């Protein structure tokens, strides 16, 4: 019996080892890689059923608010059929992408291909960041919303070195490589010594980008990589609308060749919102062809200052065409039990559902008017981990979900995202 147990242990270890050696090839579902803390909430999905009527896909790279440095606020957004993504905040980037690219079905669904040398999880994650994230919308400059971008910035650029570009031709025509080829660099692209204007855009309001440039990318906290060709800053005015075609370093004669592709076929409008003593941002993204809209809120909520947070959000709702709205990303840092005076610019479930009332009442309505939000997905960001005493013995995610559903009077589809699980919108 003793020897039988030893033999069984040996085979178990061999099997576990083979899973590690094969890296991502065996991970067809997220539960094969890690077990979420709690499955008693709806976390969306990207199966054929989930995506049947969807236009967009979002990928949570980081879902918590503080403490968990491996999963801080960050999402990717793309249109179905595209392999280019826009970052929405960037608290955690590399860890979320690493988890994502280890899912075999993800790579096939998005037709993601890698250079022959990219066999390790870290190589694939870094390649994805370089070749598939086109740029970043940053809502405010707190570290839990920009730290991932700062830390991975040294590797966030396609290199003209032979081991990355020439080896990957002609097999890879997706992501940024596909974009650059469409712009007209087909003949000389593999052999050029530098990629013309290959800087990724960092887009935000003045206060956010000024802080990133002077407090983070300043040569002291982190090397000033935007000054060395990694990024370009694009400053948005409050309430102004811009085309993504104008938020790129490429000349217009090149951008017109991709103007019907995501994200260049989208408009973005920014709104200054309250985050206690800091100015945060809400972004409305609008498809210029279909009119469909996505709203992304960086941190916001009840303030200890005189900032009128509800009025600021009201201005966002007044720019929403309710029948075109696909999703709202918004934070719920705390549960309903937390008092107003310790929220410091954050929200609770009861605050969010009041905002849903306001959205339905103040958005641009149809005729006859819509009376519910059943067509809208509500993606909850920035849930802080449950670290204190809790009489319910539940995770923060489950408590927030339950409290939202208890007062969900408009039928909005509440989603508590899990890191690395794509969600169709």
From Swiss-Prot:
One of its GO terms (molecular function) is 3',5'-cyclic-AMP phosphodiesterase activity. GO terms for cellular component: cell surface; extracellular region. Residues 1-17 form the signal peptide. It catalyses: 3',5'-cyclic AMP + H2O = AMP + H(+); 3',5'-cyclic GMP + H2O = GMP + H(+). Pfam families: PDEase_II. It comes from the Eukaryota. Keywords: cAMP, cAMP-binding, cGMP, cGMP-binding, Hydrolase, Nucleotide-binding, Secreted, Signal. Phosphodiesterase with dual cAMP/cGMP specificity. However, displays a preference for cAMP over cGMP. Seems to regulate cAMP/cGMP concentration especially during cell aggregation. This is cAMP/cGMP-dependent 3',5'-cAMP/cGMP phosphodiesterase 7. It comes from Dictyostelium discoideum (Social amoeba). The lineage of its organism: Eukaryota, Amoebozoa, Evosea, Eumycetozoa, Dictyostelia. The gene is pde7.
């Amino acid at each position: 019996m003793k020897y039988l147990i030893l033999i069984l242990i040996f085979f178990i270890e061999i099997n576990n080892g083979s899973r590690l050696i094969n890296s991502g090839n065996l991970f067809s579902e997220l539960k094969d890689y890690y077990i979420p803390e709690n499955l008693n909430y709806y976390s969306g999905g990207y199966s054929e059923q989930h995506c049947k009527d969807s236009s967009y896909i979002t990928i949570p790279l980081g879902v918590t608010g503080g403490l968990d440095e491996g999963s801080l606020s960050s999402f990717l957004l793309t249109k179905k059929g595209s392999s280019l993504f826009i970052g929405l905040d960037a608290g955690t980037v590399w860890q979320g992408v690493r988890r994502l690219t280890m899912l075999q079905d993800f790579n096939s669904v998005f037709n993601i291909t890698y250079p022959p040398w990219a066999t390790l999880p870290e190589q694939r994650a870094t390649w994805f960041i370089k070749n598939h994230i086109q740029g970043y919308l940053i809502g405010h400059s707190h570290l839990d919303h920009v730290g991932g971008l700062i830390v991975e910035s040294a590797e966030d650029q396609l290199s003209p070195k032979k081991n990355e570009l020439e080896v990957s031709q002609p097999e890879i025509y997706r992501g940024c490589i596909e974009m650059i080829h469409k712009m007209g660099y087909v003949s000389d692209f593999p052999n050029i010594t530098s990629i013309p204007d290959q800087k990724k855009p960092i887009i935000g309001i003045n206060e956010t980008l000024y802080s990133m440039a002077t407090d983070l990318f300043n040569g002291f906290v982190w090397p000033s990589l935007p000054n060395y060709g990694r990024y370009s800053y694009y400053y948005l005015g409050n309430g102004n609308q811009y085309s993504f075609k104008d938020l790129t370093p490429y000349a217009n004669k090149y951008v017109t060749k991709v103007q019907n592709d995501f994200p260049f076929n989208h408009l973005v409008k920014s709104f200054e919102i309250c985050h206690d003593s800091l100015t945060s941002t809400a972004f409305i993204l609008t498809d210029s062809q279909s009119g469909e809209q996505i709203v992304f809120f960086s941190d916001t909520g009840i303030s200890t200052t005189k900032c009128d947070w509800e009025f600021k959000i009201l201005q966002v709702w007044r720019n929403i065409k309710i029948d075109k709205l696909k999703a709202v990303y918004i934070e719920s840092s705390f549960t309903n039990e937390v008092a107003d005076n310790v929220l410091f610019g954050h929200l609770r479930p009861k605050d969010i559902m009041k905002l849903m009332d306001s959205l339905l009442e103040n958005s641009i309505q149809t005729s006859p008017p819509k009376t519910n939000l059943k067509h809208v997905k509500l993606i909850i960001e920035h849930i802080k981990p449950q670290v204190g005493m809790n009489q319910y013995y539940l995770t923060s995610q489950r408590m927030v979900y339950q409290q939202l559903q208890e007062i969900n009077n408009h039928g909005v589809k509440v989603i508590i995202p899990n890191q690395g699980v794509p969600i169709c919108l």
